[in-house]
Curated annotation (Swiss-Prot):
Belongs to the UPF0297 family. NCBIfam families: PRK05473.1. This is UPF0297 protein RBAM_024500. It comes from the Bacteria. HAMAP family: UPF0297. It comes from Bacillus velezensis (strain DSM 23117 / BGSC 10A6 / LMG 26770 / FZB42) (Bacillus amyloliquefaciens subsp. plantarum). InterPro entries: IreB (IPR009309).
Amino acid sequence: MSSFDKTMKFNFSDDSAETNVEEVLNTVYDALQEKGYNPINQIVGYLLSGDPAYIPRHRDARNLIRKLERDELIEELVKSYLEQHKEA
């Protein structure tokens, strides 16, 4: 069996204690709204492309979001979504 046939486990360090993902996303969301953008579209654009131009400098949102890895943001979003929509 080749290594391409095996499921790989994805791990990354949990340094999010320094930078709170929820706080960052809320600040970025508010900054985008204040500037008249659709926050969801802009955040998705950033997450897919990695291009910080989707996030304004307003309220230091661009610098804040760049302190976090995109995979960390996606992990937190998926985790939050599943926790809220999980059928128990």
